[in-house]
């Protein structure tokens, strides 16, 4: 039985967020094809994720003990390390990821839990795991010159790669706010892609 961590980074409802419309469909299909897997939903806004304080940083860099697994910050890093698969439902905001997702990434990118330092430098500890990023965007960022502006999916892929997650897929619904676009068709295409990836994820 695999453990999937479903990470939601948007204050909107499942019905009003176009990212969540796709991600909820992904999860629905995933459940159908992986009925024995455990799915843990982590709504970052409901979790009360915040920016790290000086005290938080001191705790993160302190030696880890058995009690660290219950620390209000470190528990998220341990949870992330224990999962086998990750689904990130995070829209593009101003070319990047929502700030709350960056704050969460600061919670989970912890030396000794999700990566470690060696004589050769940093080494990810999450090898063999897989992730998918589901993202809705108002514009189009697949081709130049706008692809150079895209720092949401690129950052998430990079930081997960740093932690050892090399199997990374992306499902995007782009051009949703461009005048004259067929939004219904764009969403339909993204939902079909989500179905296909969910089946074998």
From Swiss-Prot:
**Enzyme nomenclature, EC number:** 1.6.5.-, 1.7.1.17
Question: One MF term in GO for this entry?
Answer: electron transfer activity
**Binding sites annotated in the UniProt record for FMN:** 92-95
Note on how the cofactor is bound: Binds 1 FMN per subunit.
Keywords recorded for this protein, A-Z: Flavoprotein, FMN, NAD, Oxidoreductase
Q: Name one Pfam family in it.
A: Flavodoxin_2
Record's InterPro entries? Flavodoxin_fold, Flavoprotein-like_sf, FMN-dep_NADH:Q_OxRdtase_AzoR1, NADH:quinone_OxRdtase_FMN_depd
The cofactor(s) it depends on are: FMN
Q: Which reaction does this chain catalyze?
A: 2 a quinone + NADH + H(+) = 2 a 1,4-benzosemiquinone + NAD(+); N,N-dimethyl-1,4-phenylenediamine + anthranilate + 2 NAD(+) = 2-(4-dimethylaminophenyl)diazenylbenzoate + 2 NADH + 2 H(+)
User: Could you describe the subunit structure of this protein?
Assistant: Homodimer.
Function of this protein?
Answer: Quinone reductase that provides resistance to thiol-specific stress caused by electrophilic quinones. Also exhibits azoreductase activity. Catalyzes the reductive cleavage of the azo bond in aromatic azo compounds to the corresponding amines.
Similarity annotation: Belongs to the azoreductase type 1 family.
Protein name, please? Answer: FMN-dependent NADH:quinone oxidoreductase
Q: Taxonomy-wise, where does this protein's organism fall, top ranks first?
A: Bacteria, Bacillati, Bacillota, Bacillota incertae sedis, Caldicellulosiruptorales
